[in-house]
Amino acid sequence: MKGLRKSILCLVLSAGVIAPVTSGMIQSPQKCYAYSINQKAYSNTYQEFTNIDQAKAWGNAQYKKYGLSKSEKEAIVSYTKSASEINGKLRQNKGVINGFPSNLIKQVELLDKSFNKMKTPENIMLFRGDDPAYLGTEFQNTLLNSNGTINKTAFEKAKAKFLNKDRLEYGYISTSLMNVSQFAGRPIITKFKVAKGSKAGYIDPISAFAGQLEMLLPRHSTYHIDDMRLSSDGKQIIITATMMGTAINPK
């Protein structure tokens, strides 16, 4: 299909988890932790959209299949308006919602439940852009050189800390079907490999910020960082990560 290519990629599965990372489409500072794990690698194929019209058509077709209830749609719309607040609370409490205001508990429960209906029908590549704080506060002021390129010493330090590690995100993870224009100025691009049948929902049709081709991933998800490399112009770190799944499975 023109505008759509299939990439042969290496999956790395692992056992174990770590600590919180990100969530809105553009990320705010937070602490992150990682540890080494046992690995098992194998090859698979993922679809990567390069044409915006085809990406929208695919996403809209998926959205029509979900059959979300009115309350589930309202919870998603509300989330897109206040993702930072919701995810901030989830990270602060390590995913535990006991003690949250009753309306927020209800919203989180509805969001979690909606993922029972939102699953990807095929292996697919998703994207998100982040600032240096994604790697932790220690990189916030050291990752970029004055000319906008990635500092190689800081990059090697980040690789030593995160490459071939698992990361656990207590909040929801906003991604896009394409490496869209709003990521152009972001120094970190993560390419998520999401396997067929994984919980992931195309929510752009009802997002408060439509046009980002947004795919939402569930909270308390773990992903494995398979690869970290510099872009050809040296201005971005390209991370490839495999989504491992979520520990949240509501009935």
Curated annotation (Swiss-Prot):
GO CC, any one term: extracellular region
Keywords: Glycosyltransferase, Host-virus interaction, NAD, Nucleotidyltransferase, Secreted, Signal, Transferase
Coiled coil: none
One of the record's GO molecular function terms: NAD+-protein mono-ADP-ribosyltransferase activity
EC number: 2.4.2.-
Domain of life (superkingdom): Viruses
Main function: ADP-ribosylates eukaryotic Rho and Rac proteins on an asparagine residue.
Assembly, per entry: Monomer. Interacts with human RALA.
Protein's UniProt name: Mono-ADP-ribosyltransferase C3
Organism: Clostridium botulinum D phage (Clostridium botulinum D bacteriophage)
Lineage of the organism: Viruses, Duplodnaviria, Heunggongvirae, Uroviricota, Caudoviricetes
